[in-house]
Amino acid sequence: MDAKTNDGKAGQCPFTSGRGHKNRDWWPEQLDVQVLHQKSNLSNPMGRDFDYASAFASLDLNAVIADLKALMTDSQDWWPADFGHYGGLMVRMAWHSAGTYRITDGRGGAGGGQQRFAPLNSWPDNVLLDRARRLLWPIKQKYGRKISWADLYVLAGNAALESMGFKPLGFAGGRVDEWEPQELFWGPEGAWLGDERYSGERELAEPLAAVQMGLIYVNPEGPNGQPDPLAAAKDIRETFLRMAMNDEETVALIAGGHTFGKTHGAGDASLVGPVPDSAPIEDQGLGWKGRFGTGKGADAIGSGLEVTWTQTPTKWDNNFFDTLFGFEWELTKSPAGAHQWRAKDAPAITPDPFDESKKHVPTMLTTDLSLRFDPIYGEISKRFHENPDQFADAFARAWFKLTHRDMGPRDRYLGPLVPKEVMIWQDPIPAVDHELVDDNDIADLKAKILASGCTVAQLVSTAWASASTFRGSDKRGGANGARIRLAPQKDWEVNQPIQLKAVLAKLEEIQAEFNDAQTGGKKVSLADLIVLGGSAAVEKAARDAGIDLKVPFTPGRMDASLDQTDVESFAPLEPRADGFRNYISDRHQFMAPEEALVDRAQLLNLTGPEMTVLVGGLRVLGANAADSRHGVFTTRPGKLTNDFFVNLLTMDTEWQPVAGQDGVYESRDRKTGTLKWTGTRVDLIFGSHSQLRAFAEVYACADSGEKFANDFAAAWAKVMNADRFDLKA
């Protein structure tokens, strides 16, 4: 077959994909359900049974680190090392791998090794990092499946720091590689460096945590390229806050990272080739091929900035602050035309990366000067300048947090280099220190819970509120810890605080009575009782519908204390909308309700069918927030029936918007006009969207009652156990 494609015809037939349009091209506003089916085993070459934790346990980590350190000074002709050392490049690669993390939805971060895929591999802010990854390939090739790319990126950053005289706090493995690009909302813009994400007085849209499309944090030249250090400080503070860093951590990270290496802007930026995913096939995935001089070494062009921050760019010291405070600064431009700063009336004291006989005047970025001239950052910077030990400690802690923030609890950390210290941002939960309840205890506790006076709806709502905070993105939230009884979760509107307090009081009575009656050290945690109560209610609802159902339950959750809870960091877990509970808050919504439902389902690691069956079941069980009747398409609430789907899909009724109630609809009998039900966009999407309707039709069939109940129980248990990493080990 002639595989030529340059005539636009040959090579297309008989392939049906060709260059034709996809469904999303024809209907771009259609709800995207495919995000629920990412990370499929079908794209994983390691196979379903591959156990990365076991493979990592067999790794000689010290040997890998030794190889990484040897790499740092083994300069390659195809991409020569600045100052004879790849340390600065590797620190930047690790930083940018982890630095996509955003606290609003927990997405981004180093886990999964997404930097090797589009769009991250082609972001302007990741220019030339493809070289760092290619330099690592021989080491990855040597150790194979024993270390993931995701772990290797972070470990390379740590090894680089060590090789330049800095001692990191530690390293945890456990980041499992992903095998396809994530489809994430990185911003509304259709062009690199666009900034349509702002409104009002430079208010950055959520959940975004970078100022422009294709940047990790901020524009190093200043807001939209305007070289204003004070304005840049505002951007820095907002973006670093959105990736869970306070002011001290921010200063430590910027100053610590900029202690090493340099930026690249040797010539005209127009002489840089296409990004990796647009590069010609013969370039084999390497992008940004330079046509200025040799295109490498002294002729390299990356960001367009040409800055070396210190006089010792391959050594950990305090020279960044020495330079920052030691000179006055004047605006200039790099050879590529980018705004940067040079020291006024300063001698040429900064080394050249490739010619030892040359020296240069000290240079800084606009965002570096922010650390001096912003009043808050300036005070911290002066303290770090005067107290190098404080700076080193702050950088070590901030670097560890940066590179491990998306890994979740310490239970997931692997390897001998894990720090012993427990940090509050890890959302610690006490280890199990008592005998767990057995099957007989569980049966007795279920009976007591159901006899407590709490309704099915109340028990289901409480368990769902506790467990559904889980985010598969950064592995935070979930039922373990019973943090639903603590601030801020106990006060969230969606959790119905008055009802929640009453239900928790009943469960705490049962817990105290059970624990006080034990003589052998056996106990039950409130976290376990909350989940058990919800599961007992689901089983009762199934029995009342004529179906014998057993919801899987495994004890072992523990109760966290308020001292173990960073209240402020849990605030972003509060849902603006929760379609599973038909809830929309008064806060600004940056997604349509049905999009928010899919988004939350994706964070819960649910599939399309699981999302569908859970919505249908939760509606008939009465789990709506504020006891709303929207979507409760049944005359027998509290029973686990498929009525939601049957009554949604019938053609005996028709739907119309309710005047004056945006997003609310009513269903009336086609013949009599009698009002039957009311529902929201989240409810109606299961009849409107073709794929979701296909799922709904499965559960609406006359023979689907038992399948519906069993599928609901399985999906319910999946959510209840979403944070039980001890069960998945």
Swiss-Prot record:
Region annotated Disordered, chain positions? 1-24
Task: Please name the Pfam families in this protein's record.
Answer: peroxidase
Q: Where is this site: Transition state stabilizer?
A: 92
Q: Which GO terms describe its molecular function?
A: catalase activity; heme binding; metal ion binding
Write out the catalysed reaction: H2O2 + AH2 = A + 2 H2O; 2 H2O2 = O2 + 2 H2O
Q: Which GO terms describe its cellular component?
A: cytosol
Q: Report keywords, A-Z.
A: Heme, Hydrogen peroxide, Iron, Metal-binding, Oxidoreductase, Peroxidase
In its record, the post-translational modification comment is:
Formation of the three residue Trp-Tyr-Met cross-link is important for the catalase, but not the peroxidase activity of the enzyme.
Q: Tell me the cofactor note.
A: Binds 1 heme b (iron(II)-protoporphyrin IX) group per dimer.
Where heme b is bound, by residue?
258
- Active site per UniProt: 96 (proton acceptor)
EC number per UniProt: 1.11.1.21
Q: Where is the signal peptide?
A: none
Q: Which cofactor does it need?
A: heme b
Cross-link Tryptophyl-tyrosyl-methioninium (Tyr-Met) (with W-95) residue location(s): 217-243
UniProt cross-references to InterPro entries, sorted A to Z: Catalase_peroxidase, Haem_peroxidase, Haem_peroxidase_sf, Peroxidases_AS, Peroxidases_heam-ligand_BS
**Cited PANTHER family:** CATALASE-PEROXIDASE, HYDROPEROXIDASE I, BIFUNCTIONAL CATALASE-PEROXIDASE
Annotated family: Belongs to the peroxidase family. Peroxidase/catalase subfamily.
Quote the function comment for this protein. Bifunctional enzyme with both catalase and broad-spectrum peroxidase activity.
What subunit structure does UniProt give?
Answer: Homodimer or homotetramer.
Q: What is this protein called?
A: Catalase-peroxidase
Q: Native species of this protein?
A: Nitrobacter winogradskyi (strain ATCC 25391 / DSM 10237 / CIP 104748 / NCIMB 11846 / Nb-255)
Could you tell me the gene encoding this protein?
katG
